[in-house]
């Protein structure tokens, strides 16, 4: 607890930009091995949490990202590569006691992708938590089909010579 969080950075906030830290609060659902609550210094009213992931070598048209999100107090939007998902979590008790689910299946880029979470705190403690899982088909190596085809031709020619 209190250590700098390594997966997210704060790219916008009010009154200033801070590094998020791992936190806990007895009112929140407990952290686990998959995720922990991250927070900002007291008095911060809004923040944009950002993380990146790389889809190099994957077919982006097959990509899907499943997110479980919890927040104290409000999530106003989630962006994938600058495009809004239209996702939000209203202020209220359940927002930090249960998960809200979001599936993203478009707007992915070949290479590095950026996820941004817009969180608003209404005073007192504020925190954010996400668990992510995803799927994408691997892109075959360029020319792998040609090499495979040439290999089959070579196998067929070898069999003809032996016959």
Where are these regions (language model features)?
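Short loop/turn positions at the edges of beta-strands in beta-sheet-rich folds
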Residues: 59, 71-72
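Short, charged juxtamembrane terminal tails flanking transmembrane helices
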Residues: 161-163
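Beta-strand-rich ligand-recognition modules
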Residues: 70, 76-136
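Extended carbohydrate-recognition surfaces in non-catalytic/accessory domains of CAZymes
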Residues: 1-64, 117, 121
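A short, hydrophobic C-terminal helix/tail in secreted or cell-surface proteins
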Residues: 140-158
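Short, solvent-exposed coil/turn segments
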Residues: 46-48, 95-97, 140
């Amino acid at each position: 607890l209190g250590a700098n969080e390594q997966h997210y950075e704060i790219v916008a906030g009010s009154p200033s930009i801070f590094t998020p830290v791992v936190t806990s609060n007895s009112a929140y659902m407990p952290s686990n091995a998959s995720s922990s609550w991250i927070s900002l210094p007291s008095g911060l009213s809004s923040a944009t949490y950002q993380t990146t992931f790389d889809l190099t070598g994957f077919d982006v048209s097959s990509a899907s990202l499943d997110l479980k999100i919890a927040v104290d107090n409000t999530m106003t939007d989630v962006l994938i590569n600058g495009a809004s998902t239209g996702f939000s979590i209203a202020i209220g008790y359940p927002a930090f006691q249960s998960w809200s689910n979001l599936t993203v299946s478009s707007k992915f880029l070949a290479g590095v992708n950026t996820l941004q979470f817009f969180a608003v705190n209404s005073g007192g403690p504020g925190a954010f938590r996400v668990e992510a899982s995803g799927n994408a088909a691997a892109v075959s190596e360029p020319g792998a089909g040609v090499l495979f085809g040439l290999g089959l031709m070579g196998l067929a020619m070898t069999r003809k010579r032996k016959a």
